[in-house]
């Protein structure tokens, strides 16, 4: 007997494999966790009670790690954060051996962040439990794209026909890639803008409109998403100086006037104030949804953990 599941994927490794209706299903699932997080005196559910969630972050993180930890704990999971700095990885253990070790411990969920593109897929191929990609190199960051989509839908009520401008360091941003894929699947028109040194070659193949002038890119835009300069991934020479970058590509109050009157300003964090975005814009609650993105992140990750666990139980025939 074959099972028909609303979300038939064993892992969540990227947005690219998902159909639009599957993305919308995850957004709908997240809505009930938004309600729980906002309304409940005790923010706790037993959906993952008795299950073990391991967060293995091979790359530094604050928001994403905390968000996944809170999400797992609110669902009742036993959450373990793997201290990579003190692990056998630092002693030369291969990624595959690490994956086999984690699998032998019978973890029920693995949340992985890694600096190498494709590393999370490599781990997923070696383990029995669901794997969630918390960001791999310059490849994808699916839960960030999902929480961004959730934020946009809650503010705008739709995706079809929206003009979304993604601005900044597109070259090194896995967030940009996942957001582009998700938003286009959902019917939005995506523009990208940045200096030519920070725009990946052939990105037009993803269906985006490319700009090198911020004013033109955000003109009439419904959503403006700013990205930080990922200097930790740069060898140098990508921009002349932070001052010049801000002058050309920093979002100011004056530049924001070029966008739609009800423009939504977003940023995945962390912010570099005075570089890609001015404080006056980031802190303006009329336009800025940056804090709301953080809130939606917990609910969205709760939904992903819950959905993948339910899918596994259905396939395994567990009660």
UniProtKB/Swiss-Prot annotation:
Record lineage: Bacteria, Pseudomonadati, Pseudomonadota, Alphaproteobacteria, Sphingomonadales
GO annotation terms (biological process): 'de novo' pyrimidine nucleobase biosynthetic process; 'de novo' UMP biosynthetic process; amino acid metabolic process
HAMAP family from the UniProt entry: Asp_carb_tr
Name of the gene this protein is made from: pyrB
Protein name per its UniProtKB record: Aspartate carbamoyltransferase catalytic subunit
Xref: InterPro entries: Asp/Orn_carbamoyltranf_P-bd (IPR006132), Asp/Orn_carbamoylTrfase (IPR006130), Asp/Orn_carbamoylTrfase_sf (IPR036901), Asp_carbamoyltransf (IPR002082), Asp_carbamoyltransf_Asp/Orn-bd (IPR006131)
Species in which this protein is naturally found: Zymomonas mobilis subsp. mobilis (strain ATCC 31821 / ZM4 / CP4)
Family classification: Belongs to the aspartate/ornithine carbamoyltransferase superfamily. ATCase family.
Class of enzymatic activity (EC top level): transferase
Binding site for carbamoyl phosphate: 63-64, 113, 141, 144, 269-270
GO MF term list: amino acid binding; aspartate carbamoyltransferase activity
Superkingdom classification of source: Bacteria
Ranges in coiled-coil conformation: none
Keyword hit for Transferase: yes
Gene Ontology cellular-component terms listed: cytosol
Annotated binding of L-aspartate, by residue: 91, 174, 228
Protein role: Catalyzes the condensation of carbamoyl phosphate and aspartate to form carbamoyl aspartate and inorganic phosphate, the committed step in the de novo pyrimidine nucleotide biosynthesis pathway.
